[in-house]
Amino acid sequence: MSQKGKGSCPRPQQVPRLLVKGGIEVLDVKSGPDSITTIEAYLQPRPGQKNGYSTVITVQAEGYQDAPHSTEVPCYSCARIPLPTINDDITCPTLLMWEAVSVKTEVVGVSSILNMHSGAFRAFNGYGGGFTICGPRIHFFSVGGEPLDLQACMQNSKTVYPAPLIGPGEGERRETAQVLDTGYKARLDKDGLYPIECWCPDPAKNENTRYYGNLTGGPETPPVLAFTNTTTTILLDENGVGPLCKGDGLFLSAADVAGTYVDQRGRQYWRGLPRYFSIQLRKRNVRNPYPVSGLLNSLFNDLMPRMTGQSMQGSDAQVEEVRVYEGMEGLAPEIDMPPKAPR
């Protein structure tokens, strides 16, 4: 409901006041403890090649000889977005940490699947249009304060993944890799190197990460993909706490394989699509987990999680836009009106 101002004129509805908007450099702007930061970024797919496709999918006659090429195995995408340091004194009993509150995300390029004229295998005895992308597909994403924890579970424990891909274990692999063997775990710390087919999110860990996914199988399953900018996923747990960004870093990962493309010779190629993220963060007061003695040790020990991910800094940064909100102001009739200068 609108509020009454002077006389009979209604007051505008109060909404968060936009403090500043821009690229990754906006994160350097100092903001108050009650400010809200929104980061827009995207992750490119890693189906095998950087063009969004894999090379031809090969099949071995015997499982014990399975050794796929590195360019035909879809892998997880991941990145770390650096956040500004918000604590001037880390010896205090309490600290401020970035907390991921909500995310809007969608797969980009869904409409490209309608292409039926670019050399695909033709329907109706070679007289119809080309088959669109179809078959097995997976859609997955995660948002966390540290890298995603992974648990191995393979279809064939004899599969050998060539370098630089990272498969479960080293050397001779146990057959228990085909079920849940807790000896085969990892962290998603490198972009495009962890095969989706043998690594899944670890349900026993990931307390500081929220992940979501679904898979549809079948050799010719038609793709069913929805896209909208109105769906928000809340990242808070049952205690009202979202992922806390350790080391002032926000970690994103994705796996979006829309199916396979079939050429006119019947050869199949995986097709990957990029994913867009819009994450809202706030500042959360937490108990200082680092005693003074630990701070001294940290001079010699790297305590912060690291990741070799997609570019989120520099000229090739995949951060689309950053918004910082602080305080409240009257609702404007135009969404894109320039923000008021900070007082």
Curated annotation (Swiss-Prot):
Q: Which UniProt keywords apply?
A: Capsid protein, Disulfide bond, Host nucleus, Host-virus interaction, Late protein, T=7 icosahedral capsid protein, Viral attachment to host cell, Viral penetration into host cytoplasm, Virion, Virus endocytosis by host, Virus entry into host cell
- Which example biological process does GO assign this protein? endocytosis involved in viral entry into host cell
| Subcellular location as annotated | Virion; Host nucleus
**Which ranges of the sequence are coiled-coil?**
none
Can you name a GO cellular component term?
T=7 icosahedral viral capsid
Q: How does it assemble?
A: Homomultimer; disulfide-linked. The virus capsid is composed of 72 icosahedral units, each one composed of five disulfide-linked copies of VP1. Interacts with minor capsid proteins VP2 and VP3.
Q: Which family does it belong to?
A: Belongs to the polyomaviruses coat protein VP1 family.
Q: What this chain does, per the record?
A: Forms an icosahedral capsid with a T=7 symmetry and a 46-48 nm diameter. The capsid is composed of 72 pentamers linked to each other by disulfide bonds and associated with VP2 or VP3 proteins. Interacts with sialic acids on the cell surface to provide virion attachment to target cell. Once attached, the virion is internalized by endocytosis and traffics to the endoplasmic reticulum. Inside the endoplasmic reticulum, the protein folding machinery isomerizes VP1 interpentamer disulfide bonds, thereby triggering initial uncoating.
The Swiss-Prot or TrEMBL note on domains reads: The N-terminal region contains a nuclear signal but the presence of VP2 and VP3 proteins is required for efficient nuclear transport.
The name under which this protein is listed is Major capsid protein VP1
At the highest ranks, the source species' classification is: Viruses, Monodnaviria, Shotokuvirae, Cossaviricota, Papovaviricetes
